[in-house]
Amino acid sequence: ARTEGLVNPRPAELFFGRYLLFFVLSQLQAAIIVTGDLYLLKVQCLHPGAMYLTASLTAFTFSLLIYSMALSFGDVGKALVVVIMVMQIAGSSGTFPIELLPEIYQKIYRFFPFPYAIDAMRECICGMYGSYYGQQLAFLLLFAAAALLIGLLVRRPFMGLNHFMEEKLEETELL
């Protein structure tokens, strides 16, 4: 990261300073998507305010997770994010009930944030059932906390390895 003109920036300040752009873009995207769902597609939603909140928290969690993985693990982190995304789309109970999916997805789907976001959105659209909505948001916040740990703590030990991997990748002239 370029740090000219900055007086002794701490790693956390650099992390959040760079993440701010991704945060703003993800929040704008979430607001545009929910507005389009509600007013263009006319999705019947019992709790539109909660839908905006859920989309905002989901965008925050996913953008932070992607940013942390890419920053901490470099190209390997980017590849991991793609694998996680594909596995979540295939096995998150968003397209079919989880009980109808292959057994591997039934075992791993709760270890990804996507099912919690989907369940929270369902609560917003169909109606709230007890504290289930709050539980789903709490799980999303746990994934955001894990992403922060990856981005702020795990990154430092991998900096040398990432630099080595990038040099070797440049030597291959594949990218």
Report each predicted region and the residues it spans.
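Membrane-spanning alpha-helical segments of multipass transporters and channels
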Residues: 1-175
